[in-house]
Amino acid sequence: MGKIIGIDLGTTNSCVAVMQGTQPTVIENSEGNRTTPSMVAFTKTGDRLVGQAAKRQAITNPKNTIFSIKRFIGRKFDEVPNEKKIAPYEVVNEGGEARVKINDKTYSPQEVSAMILQKMKQTAEDFLGEKVTEAVITVPAYFNDAQRQATKDAGRIAGLEVKRIINEPTAAALAYGLDRKQTSEKVAVFDLGGGTFDISILELGDGVFEVKSTDGDTHLGGDDFDQKIIDFLADEFKKQEGVDLRNDAIALQRLKEAGEKAKVELSSRTDTEINLPFITATPEGPKHLVINLTRAKFEGMCSDLFDKILEPCRRAVKNSKVEMKDIDEIVLVGGSTRIPKVQALVKEFFGKEPNRSVNPDEVVAIGAAIQGGVLKGDVTDVLLLDVTPLSLGIETLGGVMTKLIDANTTIPTRKQEVFSTAGDNQTSVEVHVLQGERPLAVDNKTLGRFHLGDIPPAPRGMPQIEVTFDIDSNGILNVSAKDKATGKEQSIKIESSSKLTDAEVEKMKEDAKVHAEEDQKRKEEIEVKNSADSLIFSTEKQLSELGEKIPADKKPVIEGALEKLKDAHKNGTIESIKGAMDELSKVWGEVASNLYQAEAPGADAPEGQAPQDGGSKKGGEGAVENAEYEVIDGDGK
């Protein structure tokens, strides 16, 4: 008997998860992403593209690229006038049903949805290494029977036996683990996705969860916010240039992508610039679209959508017979809940901060996987002695990951290491906490970042910054950085640091093997450049300090070698940098031996090394590793 997978068939993105032992795992697709665009495209050569591949070519192939098909599934043609109007692909009436016409062939929404489900099925099969035939698929709580049945039909077309169709808010409640709490609680699940909105009030206790009421709007979601921006951009451009971009399918698709991007940016910024060069052309020449959009403007033009969100909330609370003050938690689900105004409305309406503990893009699929585990009988309460599956460390100079805790270390565990600054008078350091096996920080998973400031100005290599990693028996990672001179400390708590999917773990390990040679070369380049930088710094410092003590005939030679190294460091190859370093070290070594003899800082340095202030060696007592801060003790690495 194979696994029962859980699929969130979303309007904008879809996600698939499965139970691995007692834990749900979100499965990465073939592109390495945890969510897959719910898009299907047909090329001129007859190829069918699904997911990210379809999204990448949407701008150049808008009429043959299908998105937001969930808005059509289970609906009659006359029920989707607005959706039909804004879709760049052709929607036709076939027996009263909405169909999509591509290259003289019509497809039902169920068929298109099945193509997306097949992609999710294949993703799961690639991950599990076995055939998958059963699934739990989620739908909006406010989906009607026709939409539910159509979704089930899509599963059948995709070769899946749909064991259960469950509501997205119910799945979200499972995923958040709220049903496992011992005390009775009342919870509101607020689900605003790409095309639909649900609000459900649930009562949970003793592993039983009961839906008290549900409400929503199957015509309200992130697509509608995107459309507001699209209309704004089209209207502004028409005012400026007298051209309506809505009549150009390719321009319209570019507006759609720009609108979605602007919406996302406005979740973290107060304004954004939409810049679309060569958006169209007139007899006068090419035209470019450059428009600034503020968050306030965005919120103003979406005010009617925000109002539409509140009404279902009022109805749901009223119908649940639950007093507002008795609702214990508000769970946010769906990517559109990242919009700041939405979060503010939720807080204002319910009178408390919403729960943001799980990724809103993945929570529904996780819940579906848990439901699959329940149906399979695999979900049981198991206590495990855990280990950290991947190495933990921080980013150091040149983007290198310096490990503090190795993979498969039994927890609880604690590790300390001392670092220093990499620049003179550096008054703060950023601690970038990483997890993974790759040598470079960029290739590993970021767990968090924090800053330690107010470090007294001092030459580089002098301050001592003690970084501590502490993982308790619950798998909760605490990272702290302390300036040993001042006692000032900063810390960050990273919960579930080991909560990577098995897919992520295996992908990182495989990447580490496949890219080992490339990684090693890149790491060597960084190390050589770091060494060259240190040699340049120490040479300039010694030239300045020693001044006239350096023989007149030797000083130009040293300066020439120094300039050669600087040029190689800036423009040369690794081999040329090494050669220039050797040349400078040799020249400097001759001078240093005459000046300092045995007691000189660099007299006994190994070949290729010059006297260094702080250095970049690693391993022995007192060694320092150049970082944004530098290792200066011998513990561990």
Curated annotation (Swiss-Prot):
Keywords (A to Z) from UniProt: ATP-binding, Chaperone, Nucleotide-binding, Phosphoprotein, Stress response
CDD domains, per the entry: ASKHA_NBD_HSP70_DnaK-like (cd10234)
Keyword Nucleotide-binding attributed: yes
Induction: By stress conditions e.g. heat shock.
Entry-linked InterPro entries: ATPase_NBD, Chaperone_DnaK, Heat_shock_70_CS, HSP70_C_sf, HSP70_peptide-bd_sf, Hsp_70_fam
Acidic residues biased stretches: 627-637
Superkingdom of this protein's organism: Bacteria
GO molecular function, one term: ATP binding
Residue ranges, annotated region (Disordered): 598-637
Entry-annotated residues carrying Phosphothreonine: T196
Family: Belongs to the heat shock protein 70 family.
Function: Acts as a chaperone.
Xref: PANTHER family: HEAT SHOCK PROTEIN 70KDA
NCBIfam families from the UniProt entry: PRK00290.1, PRK05183.1, prok_dnaK
Protein name: Chaperone protein DnaK
Native organism: Chlorobium luteolum (strain DSM 273 / BCRC 81028 / 2530)
